[in-house]
Amino acid sequence: MRIRLARQFAMLLAASGIAGLLSAGAQDGVSTNGSGSRAQTVIEAEQEKAKHLVPQEPPRGEWKFDHIQKNILDRIFNSNGPSLKFGGIPTGGGFSLGPQYTRQDLLADQLTWNTYFAGSTRKWYGGGSSFDFHDLLNGHLELIADGGYQNSASVWYFGEGPDSSKSNKTDFNREFTTTHFSALGHFFDQKLTVGYTVGGLLVHVGPGDLSGTPTTEKLFNGTNTPGLVQQSNFITGTTTIQVDLSRVGFSNPEGLQLEADDSQFFDQSGLQANFHLLETQATYYLPLTNGMRTLIFRLRNETAFAEDNQVVPFYLQPTLGGPDDLRGYDRYRFYGDGNSVATAEYRWSVSQTLEMAVFGEGGNVYQRPGLIGFRDVRGDGGVGFRIKNKQATVMRLDVGVSPEGVHVWFVFNDVVGKLSRIF
């Protein structure tokens, strides 16, 4: 009896186990089929959605500025052939315009030739021609030859030093004829540039032609203004070092840029005007909010060192004032054998083509190298607008305010661009 009950119990237990296994298998099959069905449904839904996707259009304002860049700015400023030259005249000469011819595709795209002539609303005029052999030796060598002529009909002069008075505003005519031959080496993926430039400079100074403003020789003389009565001709030599630790950003670079130029002036006229001019600049671009906003800090110093018993002619002295440093002051407001300037600018991008800015600046001039420091600092502030082409500013409008009034500048360069020479 007990054996029969045990057999029945074992058979019942086995039947229950088999039924459980079959039930579990059926549930797993249903679950697997359900998961596969849901995954297939998701895939089909995504494919159907993809059929109706369209590219996202930029905001209407940004589209308009991009259209201006591609159809107007690029054709004007990046033309390969005849075009218009905006600028080309030293700042202070008024709005300038003229014809230009550029070829960027010569010698297998390794030679760029540019020739231009421009005149301004203040009767300044000039022109130049350059040959730039670039990308030689796998991009490590660049050779440049250029020549030019500038006739600046009414350059302002207020006297030398930080205490010069605005009431002593005069003007003079300045003519520069120049030629240069440069050899530049580029290393470490263009991060380091070193080079040397040899050149010649012919100078003539005469009375200015600005009506209502006395000419410089009426208020100043050769004793307090070296080079006013007689001008020198020079052979020049400039050593250049540039270190670019920046990278490409949304509309401005990001990082640090360092520059130094040391120019020797060898007087060929026997007028005791041998000197050298040391120019240094450090610029730091700090990106904010994914590069749409940028803080820019710039420090620049220019100091002229005259040899023993020599002088620095006033027409080659470093100056402060104008669209590139103290924008709240007249162009060429302060002359001296040295100057320092600090600039802070906050920029925000409306698009990659349009940018707005607020800025503040401070700077001073000194009459000999030993007086470098923070004496007699002048300051200003203001707002500005820039029209840009890729990473470069091609046009800007700045309004600077200082104790000497409000000044408006419309120019074709970047306020914190590379060091530039007037000679």
Features from the language model and the residues they span:
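Outer-membrane beta-barrel initiation region
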Residues: 25-144, 205, 223-253, 323, ...
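Transmembrane beta-strands of outer-membrane beta-barrel proteins
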Residues: 82-84, 111-115, 141-147, 192-196, ...
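Transmembrane beta-strands of outer-membrane beta-barrel pores
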Residues: 86-92, 103-105, 117-123, 133-135, ...
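Extracellular loop and loop/strand-boundary signature of outer-membrane beta-barrel proteins
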Residues: 115-117, 164-170, 221-228, 264-270, ...
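Outer-membrane beta-barrel translocator domains and adjoining extracellular loop/strand segments
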Residues: 127-131, 155-163, 206-215, 252-254, ...
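Outer-membrane beta-barrel translocator/channel fold
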Residues: 140-182, 301-319, 395-415
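Extracytoplasmic gating/loop element in the C-terminal half of outer-membrane beta-barrel translocons
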Residues: 287-363, 367
